[in-house]
Amino acid sequence: MSYINVRGVEHYYEWIRKPSIISQPKPVMVFVHGWAGSARYWQSTATALFEQFDCLLYDLRGFGRSRGKSAAVTKASEAVVESDSPQEELQALTELTYELEEYAHDLAALLNELQIQRAYIHAHSMGASIGTLFLNRYPERVEKAILTCSGVFEYDEKAFAAFHKFGSYVVKFRPQWLAKIPLVDRMFIARFLHRPIPAAERRAFLQDFLLADYDAALGTIFTSVSKAAAELMPQEFIKITVPTLLVSGEYDKIIPAEMGRQAASLNQAVEYVMIPKTAHFPMLEDAPTYLQRVREFLSMVNG
């Protein structure tokens, strides 16, 4: 497994690419996963696209195989417990936050470390929100973007409070023995799907959820679903200048298709498609249709 230090934190990454006999390098496509997931669920999509792209997959800070904190911050935090030194306390407080904009800056830093100047962005769910922020903060570094299962939503104080309470409970109750119980992977993923996906994918989702760093999982629940996010994301979609495809699943219960349609309607640079008979993972539930729409978009824009 390959790791790289990004802003002081060890990040897991991998390349899925096919050696080319042509000397000219292929364009890079970067895949960004969603909440409590990892790059693993992008592997099949990347493999399908590696004839045209060098595909870079990575685990977000605090998720999958990436660390949640830098070693320096962890040591500083432990030191604060044992000392009242203001200097040590200040060092501990330099820890990166779980604001989605911070994750967009993580992505920019990753590209810097790998000496990638420009790339295609292919992002999903919370990762698509991170991708949207990246498009607007680093537009000169993006060729085109594909945002899957993304959208805009209205703030509802009671609904958000209930979601945060439930989400906090889910994050706190994650015993490792859950992965050993038969059929738990089916129950865990059921809400996210309309069509079945391979058993290996189901198990990977559950494993990634159990692996997620507590602070990162909890922190991003509050930053991705919040009054601030509800107010910010419509403005971010309006600002997009990069050619973008927004893909929704028809029966997505997490980010309903109407939210995606509303987001795309805010900007002529954003093309919208809905994949029938899929939910929150259209790239896995109906890979042929998903890939067809993605390739059509890439071909049309390139043409």
PLM region descriptions:
Residues T278-L291:
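Catalytic histidine-centered segment of alpha/beta-hydrolase-like enzymes
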